[in-house]
Amino acid sequence: MFSRLWVRCRCSTALSAAAAGTFFFRRSQKQPEPETVDEKVSFESYSPLKLMIQKTWPRFQEHKEYRESFIRLAKCDSPDAILVRFLASCNNDSHEASQKLINTLQWRVDTGVERIVERGELYAKETNDDQFLEQLRTGKVTMLGRDLSDRPICYIQVHLHQPSKLTQNSLREMTVWVMETMRLFLRPQKTLKDSMDSPQNVNVLFDLSNFSLHNMDYSFVKYLASCLEYYYPQSLGVCILHKSPWIFRSVWNIIKGWIKPEIAAKIVFTQSANDLEKYIDYSVIPTSLGGGNKKIFQYIEPVEHENDAVIEDSAEKTAALARYYAYFSEWEQHSLNWAKLDDDDAQNEKVRLCCDAAGTNFANCYWNVDKYIRARTVYDRLKWIGNV
């Protein structure tokens, strides 16, 4: 997908060489006609990424919460990386990609994604939300390590899932928490070229050992599929269904009809450790699955005051957030200027380099504000996060 998308701009020899065979978007062959007088642009003169920016930012001006949500969505990546994901998931159609991004931002606002991230496990403990915490305490969903493609592995032991003991709201909040947390294990994409050359995604390993129909949760599968397709596009690298018993065949016949072909193509079935070793090193595969990883996940409980930086105001917090937002505004202004340039404009390279520099500053600044906008997780207590 990424290698088929190009942009046409007047580049230096070095930049052309760097972009060769990668991404710098080609012009889309299919773009909708301008709908208003204000859309007096030549669609043959602008690359899809530029068109996406042109279409999206007026919506940010109308709905300030969308801009805020986009900033928080970017996390430790350049904002360009987010735009690239949505464009790639829409086959380079800037109109569709822009609308998909806006829908995602509205979903994040409606779902309260940032509220879930800011409250985290300590809030669940303080409010006696045992449903949320038990899903972590049991080790049902854990970060296992990295696969042979350097993707983080989200390991799900399906036999530990008891849908009858969970409300849909609790399960959906946990799904969002896992999605947002796993993103922090991806390698940061700090420039447009990073987004082109090294798309980052996750390996999801479903361990179906000891699976029974009591563990099946069709509502969860539908919700997860919709999240991957609409709200976290291009996030799934491979989905491994390991040791599926014969009773899973009937289940699979039902759920495969809900999954889009793009996602279905990333699903593989394995039965043995040898099968898994095509994707995961033997040393990472748990001994319970025939591998050499003897480590047993031990959940560490949240501790009092660990999220004080999120809750309390301070001069340091105000200054750090101001810098973070300033870097985003700088990237934003350069990107809006770049999006106005015809692809043949001589200023393309200069302005694009300014975009990348600002995007890199924004991405690098994230870890200075992380403690102010995200509750600590078990992976912070294990000292796994921030060391990707």
From Swiss-Prot:
Primary localization class, coarse: mitochondrion
SMART domains reported for this sequence: SEC14
GO BP terms in the entry: intermembrane phospholipid transfer; phospholipid transport
Every CRAL-TRIO domain range: 129-297
Key word Mitochondrion present: yes
Annotated Gene3D superfamilies: CRAL-TRIO lipid binding domain
GO terms assigned for molecular function: phosphatidylinositol transfer activity
Span of the transit peptide along the chain: 1-28
PROSITE patterns in UniProt: CRAL_TRIO
Domain of life: Eukaryota
Keyword Zinc: no
GO cellular component, one term: mitochondrion
CDD domains for the chain: SEC14
Localization terms from the record: Mitochondrion
Pfam families: CRAL_TRIO (PF00650)
Keywords carried by this UniProt record: Mitochondrion, Transit peptide
PANTHER family linked to this entry: CRAL-TRIO DOMAIN-CONTAINING PROTEIN C589.09, MITOCHONDRIAL, PHOSPHATIDYLINOSITOL TRANSFER PROTEIN CSR1-RELATED
Record protein name field: CRAL-TRIO domain-containing protein C589.09, mitochondrial
